[in-house]
Design a protein with these regions (language model features):
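Multi-pass membrane proteins that catalyze or facilitate reactions on polyprenyl-/lipid-phosphate substrates
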Residues: 1-58, 69-289, 293-373
Length: 373
């Protein structure tokens, strides 16, 4: 059996995953499963799926949080931090460069034509994602009704996205049997992985890692809150960025496509940082870079800083601030929740809440496709 890798051996693997994680969460999760489970047998299929279900319950990009959680399982807090950062930073660097090109040359005919083609491709990707999620989530009459209700709530009544997500979660929590067939399923196989062998030899390992994980989670929360607290009394575009994307970090259930509805309601229609067409271009850029699709938020923060914060330096500051308040909470949720994951494995009501949110996301994505179109 392959032994658990050393931290130094794991780092290049996380870097490789971060640089190759194109194609959205489904492709990214498949890449991680191939690298970590199938090829190296560091983690068993069952534990991988268990970890994925936990990350699906959290706000934020599930693929990035899955990498951070698996890194924590193998090497503690430093493993989680490195795995999570490598999943974010390559794509963030590319997105920053592409954002500069868009802001500086987006009106040049050739560049404008390229971005128009990108927008058309993204519309197709949104529809494909809608159909894929619908096939997985809408199994039974109740999920279909909930998806339709979510669509009407947004398209007809204009309800805020967080209200729709919260209502769906409460319905699934109260009525888990109606959603038992939806969402991520499959128990997986235990297998003979390096991590399972290590945990069998040291049953108290996770419990011994818990105190440091909780401290790391609290530090991440503090680092997330302090710039918001400093900027809010000052006001201005950077205070708006800090506050808005901090709110986003606690309601980003259902993936990047679903979150774009909330971004559209606020960043486009309320703050007027960018247009719907530019939002579509930003999603296209996020689709073409490695890392989580939620990096589209970095593009929004970049344009807000570019237009209202003082040009290039304001754009860099807006981009960095957006990344800070978007991803620090992701690390906090992982480190605070990781020690308790095993207890969540068979909680039917939590699974019901997740499946109901996934069903509602179908309606949310249908609204998004019409809004972009």
């Amino acid at each position: 059996m392959t032994p658990i890798p050393s931290f130094a051996e794991a780092v290049p693997v996380w870097a490789r995953i971060g640089c190759l994680s194109f194609g959205g969460p489904a492709a990214q999760i498949a890449l991680m499963q191939r690298e970590i489970v199938d090829q190296r047998r560091w983690v068993s299929d069952k534990r991988f799926l268990h970890a994925l279900n936990f990350c699906m319950l959290l706000p934020g990009p599930e693929a990035m949080q899955l990498a951070a959680y698996l890194g924590w399982l193998m090497h503690g807090v430093k493993g989680g931090v490195v795995a999570g950062l490598f999943f974010i930073l390559p794509g963030a660097a590319v997105m920053l460069a592409l954002s500069f090109i868009y802001a500086a040359f987006g009106n040049v005919p050739l560049i404008a034509a390229l971005f128009f083609g990108l927008k058309c491709a993204v519309l197709i990707l949104v529809v494909e994602a809608l159909l894929r999620v619908a096939r997985r989530a809408l199994k039974g009459a109740v999920p279909w009704v909930l998806a339709g209700a979510a669509f009407l709530a947004l398209f007809v009544f204009g309800l805020p996205f967080p209200v729709v997500v919260l209502a769906a979660a409460l319905i699934g929590f109260a009525w888990p049997d109606a959603f038992a067939k939806g969402g991520h399923g499959g128990a997986g196989t235990e297998g003979n992985s390096a991590l399972d062998a290590m945990l069998a030899a040291d049953p108290g390992r996770i419990a011994s890692m818990a105190p440091l994980a909780r401290r790391a989670g609290l530090v991440a929360l503090a680092l997330w809150v302090w710039p918001v607290a400093l900027l809010m009394p000052v006001g201005g575009v950077f205070a708006d960025i800090a506050w808005f994307f901090s709110k986003m970090s606690v309601v980003t259930f259902g993936g990047a496509y679903a979150v774009l509805v909330y971004v559209a309601q606020e960043a486009v229609e309320h703050y007027r940082w960018l247009s719907a067409s530019e939002m579509l271009a930003g999603l296209g850029l996020a689709e073409t870079t490695p890392g989580p699709l939620i990096l589209v938020l970095q593009f929004v923060g970049f344009l807000a800083g570019w237009r209202e914060g003082g040009g290039a330096w304001g754009a860099v500051a807006g981009s960095a601030l957006t990344l800070w308040v978007t991803f620090l909470p992701c690390f906090a949720w992982i480190f605070l929740g990781a020690p308790y994951v095993e207890r969540l494995h068979d909680v039917a009501r939590l699974k019901g809440a997740l499946a109901a949110v996934t069903a509602a996301v179908v309606g949310v994505m249908a609204n998004l496709a019409l809004w972009f179109g």
